[in-house]
């Protein structure tokens, strides 16, 4: 039996993550991840700047029609001395092999199963 591809997810906001100056304190931006589909999914966040950008929770499981708010935090930094071009967070998701899975498992993303990605560029308003 062929594996079903993961359905779409929705994020709010849909296009990008925005952090506003000043950048001398930690700032947090919330992204809602929504599973509008009919299958349980596992999701995981990644970033191009793991020393500056953190996500909480960084991964999880969403049942059909469920959602979660993910806190994306940016540690204090000096934008004049650091390259911010290309900064982004990426959410990856896949169908869970077990429709009743309640806990995230990294192995879902390490096999040959289908994984989808959505990139959210980070914009820094100086």
UniProtKB/Swiss-Prot annotation:
Domain MSP: 8-125
Tissue specificity as recorded in UniProt: Sperm.
Alphabetized InterPro entries for the sequence: Ig-like_fold (IPR013783), MSP_dom (IPR000535), Nematode_MSP (IPR051155), PapD-like_sf (IPR008962)
Keyword Cytoplasm: yes
Keywords per UniProt: Acetylation, Cell projection, Cytoplasm, Cytoskeleton
GO terms under cellular component: cytoplasm; cytoskeleton; pseudopodium
Superkingdom as given in the UniProt entry: Eukaryota
Keyword set includes Protease: no
Modified residues (N-acetylalanine): 2
Entry's localization field: Cell projection, Pseudopodium; Cytoplasm, Cytoskeleton
PANTHER family in the record: MAJOR SPERM PROTEIN, MSP DOMAIN-CONTAINING PROTEIN-RELATED
Stated role: Central component in molecular interactions underlying sperm crawling. Forms an extensive filament system that extends from sperm villipoda, along the leading edge of the pseudopod.
Name the record gives this protein: Major sperm protein 2
Organism name: Globodera rostochiensis (Golden nematode worm)
This protein's encoding gene: MSP-2
């Amino acid at each position: 039996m062929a594996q079903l591809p993961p359905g779409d997810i929705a994020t709010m906001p849909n296009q990008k993550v925005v952090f506003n100056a000043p950048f001398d304190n930690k700032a947090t931006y919330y992204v809602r991840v929504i599973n509008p589909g009919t299958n349980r999914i596992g999701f995981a966040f990644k970033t191009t700047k793991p020393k500056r950008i953190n996500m909480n929770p960084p991964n999880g499981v969403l049942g059909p029609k469920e959602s979660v708010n993910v806190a994306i935090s940016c540690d204090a930094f000096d934008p004049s001395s650091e390259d911010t071009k290309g900064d982004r967070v990426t959410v990856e998701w896949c169908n869970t092999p077990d429709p009743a899975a309640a806990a995230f498992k990294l192995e879902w993303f390490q096999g040959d199963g289908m994984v989808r990605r959505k990139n959210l560029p980070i914009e820094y308003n100086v």
